[in-house]
């Protein structure tokens, strides 16, 4: 894929007609995924399962999205985006129907979420690839900006959808909403261009090893069986051996010889495990401590997401006055403060948690671009596609593991202790950043 090629005006005009359709699918997919993250409380109650068990419907979904992004990006070089979108909607439909029919069996609900998410994963990745392949280079930033706004919008709508559907209908009704994506099929077939196929390949082995690494970590956090540590060690060893020997791996061993790249990945992994850890904790905490229903909890999340939108939109201007190191350090300090606040005022008014989530979400929005830029700038620009792909995969694995360890803590320690633990993990990320990256010279 060559995103820098010239696109004729007539072709670009036709290509732009497909953008609204892709954005609708993009927003719709994220709404569904975010809705299911919020209703873990309702699923656990309805099916009589533990917090740790129910967390798997969110953690495995995150893992599938991360791996799915790499798979769809690889397939887009050999299969038309049009065909991949149709396949994505097929997965969404199959998973949603299966989940609704077998809503009383958690193993089948889990399988349904995996199938459904395999389809949802197509939306974001294929939109970015479509913009790079079919729209003029000088307009690509504008269209990519639409995806950022769409993501923020989906967080708001997703939390409201999950909260109100689970409160006034039933959480299982969320499996019916994705079926509306079928209505997009005629528009996709009408406006999406037919592309020529060319040979490409997906690194199945590499992705399976990444999945094995992430899953073994999550299983160990859940059950603490030593066998999972052995599986983890074996998976890591096999992955490193594979990428050092294979000529077709999706990432080369040379990337891991770059200390700055590895350091940024380590920091990103630690800090982003905290992100969905707190978001997963939020509804459980407010439901058990304050007796709030999910519809009310979803409303309390909105100020945080709106703050993220505003900060994200302003981060470009702010970055002109701060270096990446300064921006990331400030963001991590604010994240730690947002988690320490409810610890100090535990049991106080609910507004404390609203303010906490506003600081938390805004800080992550502020940190995203400079931390990503630190990662991308560690290697030549010609390798930026691979860097971004593996960075995003790392974030998805980290958030999945964050949900897992938070769910495990919910069942064994107090909410106050969990908040303290999350703040300490954030401070650990800040220390690692200062030791490994903070003292090095930033690439020009």
Language model regions located:
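Central cavity-lining transmembrane alpha-helices of secondary-active solute carriers
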Residues: 59-74, 124, 128, 302-314
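12-transmembrane solute porter fold
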Residues: 15-32, 36-37, 51, 82, ...
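Transmembrane alpha-helical cores of Major Facilitator Superfamily
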Residues: 27, 56-63, 90, 114, ...
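Helix-loop-helix hairpins in multi-pass membrane proteins, especially solute transporters
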Residues: 69-199, 364, 393
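Extracellular/periplasmic helix-loop-helix junction of adjacent transmembrane segments
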Residues: 39-68, 106
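A membrane-interface helix-boundary motif in multi-pass transporters
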Residues: 167-179, 221-225, 408-427
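Hydrophobic transmembrane-helix bundles of small-molecule transporters
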Residues: 171-266
